[in-house]
């Protein structure tokens, strides 16, 4: 009997080390950043079983077999639609400003579609203004309303949006809503989905959280886009979730969330539409394409207006696209660079680009929240401040709530607004959306918003920062080491 237990023990030990060796080899063979690989190896060797389970669940990008098959099947029809769109050459910009030309060229070559002109943009800096405009657009909608959000939380002014959508559906408008399962978990636990479906609104739970399928699809892959489309000619996108900030996370101790949305009329709504259709088909298996270009685009052909490129990122889209776009933007800066983000955990390449910009004389400012709703990200962000301050970057800590806006302004001309945080999850993992605007007028509007943020912020003093308690430095470095996993 003792021999049997001895054999079993040796088999368990052998299997244990074989499993660790196998996962280690898998990490080393995957093409990933060295800091990320080292962080995962550290977790696995310090907490072997926990680390292995965590890596198999969250360490690799698994879209899921069914979604991957749908993505493969939908591409031919999507490619055909894009070819038809490109036949309308008059809507595409042929010239860009000097600071924007490299980025627009990158986007066109990698995504296959150039930036479109003739768009009218309106920046909205408050939740109330956004909802007021949205309710008016929903009331005037005649054909279709599509929405995708990470978080939809009933209550406050959101109830008016729900009622307006129900009214639209009852008068024959096709309404489709795609909501992330994890972000909108409270919504799906309440009666609102059934209420909306009864009225004829299609409500779909995207990327459902299922622990039993954790090894088949990455559970922390999230649908982080925020897009509203109305009659395929009006679009909204930005950082705002469908939540009333007066009611959302009031117990987090960070104040109300501050967001930025853009309302757009013009051909870029068509570009956003095809992205929404891809997300819809990937989640439901149902094909849904925007109206033909000759119906949808022609009314907006004009020489005036804003030139916009759309960057869609996430599984199934050009790899590292948003990361490359941010790097290109930073390296294009010659005079000024202002970046706003709630979560700042940049890649080594992005951090180096930002520091290099400051060191070559660019006026670089980064605006982040003073208090963060994520303790882990908050500490990890602080770990980068010393290097940024040493390079001459100005760091502003917003003190009037949780600044949730995601924006980049380069030389007052090139603007990036959307859903992308300057952290690893947005750069490498989640489904995100970004508008790239080449327009000095819009840049001036965005600069005014950023100046308002700065006026409500505290400039981080380099000397005071160097004198912070030693225990804080230890905590910062600890989270810095694990920042590739956040």
From Swiss-Prot:
Q: What is its main location?
A: membrane
Keyword annotations for this protein? Cell inner membrane, Cell membrane, Lipid biosynthesis, Lipid metabolism, Membrane, Phospholipid biosynthesis, Phospholipid metabolism, Repeat, Transferase, Transmembrane, Transmembrane helix
Any one cellular-component term (Gene Ontology): plasma membrane
Does Cell inner membrane show up as a keyword for this record?
yes
Residue ranges of every copy of the PLD phosphodiesterase domain listed in the record: 219-246, 399-426
- SMART domains given in the database record: PLDc (SM00155)
Supply the Gene3D superfamilies for this chain: Endonuclease Chain A
- Residue ranges of the TM segments: 3-23, 38-58
- Write down the chemical reaction(s) this protein catalyses: 2 a 1,2-diacyl-sn-glycero-3-phospho-(1'-sn-glycerol) = a cardiolipin + glycerol
Its annotated compartments are:
Cell inner membrane
**Which parts form a coiled-coil structure per UniProt?**
none
Entry GO MF terms: cardiolipin synthase activity
Pfam families registered for this protein in UniProt: PLDc_2, PLDc_N
Q: Which residues form the active site?
A: 224, 226, 231, 404, 406, 411
One BP term from GO: cardiolipin biosynthetic process
- The protein's Enzyme Commission number: 2.7.8.-
Instruction: Name the InterPro entries for this protein.
Output: Cardiolipin_synthase (IPR022924), CL_synthase_A (IPR030840), CLS_N (IPR027379), PLD-like_dom (IPR025202), PLipase_D/transphosphatidylase (IPR001736)
Similarity-based family: Belongs to the phospholipase D family. Cardiolipin synthase subfamily. ClsA sub-subfamily.
Question: What job does this protein perform?
Answer: Catalyzes the reversible phosphatidyl group transfer from one phosphatidylglycerol molecule to another to form cardiolipin (CL) (diphosphatidylglycerol) and glycerol.
Q: What is this protein called?
A: Cardiolipin synthase A
Taxonomic source organism: Pectobacterium atrosepticum (strain SCRI 1043 / ATCC BAA-672) (Erwinia carotovora subsp. atroseptica)
